[in-house]
Amino acid sequence: LGALASRDWRPLHHDREFAINRNGVKDIFINTPNNAAWFERYVTDWTGPKGRLGRMKFRMNQPVFPGDEMVFSGRVSRIDVDEAGCCWLDLDLAISVEGKVATSCQARVAIPRDAADNPWQRKNEHWKP
């Protein structure tokens, strides 16, 4: 469904016979926007509603198929406060299947630096991801 919702009509994401016979894989597999959505959800569930994703890049190393158990992991690699006073966390994230990293990701997320701060209120020169 993720492929269709993102208008990715490539049959390898929703036509099992095509994926197996034409691409030589065991089944359909999740597409790029679906991978991005999983990481974004993982980060924002962790940071809470005031966490604001600034940047994200990821690399898909192997496909994730229906029925695969995805295990998410992550660590904070850097904490920084920029010149505008925004608190940034650099994250190293991964989705693993059967103990192997299927997709690795680096993300930069803003979090409140104190109870009065809200990264969602930052604009223009105060928002520099």
PLM feature segments, named:
Residues 55-61:
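Short structured motifs
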Residues 1-53, 114-129:
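Hot-dog-fold acyl-thioester-processing enzymes
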Residues 64-129:
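HotDog/MaoC-like acyl-thioester-processing domains
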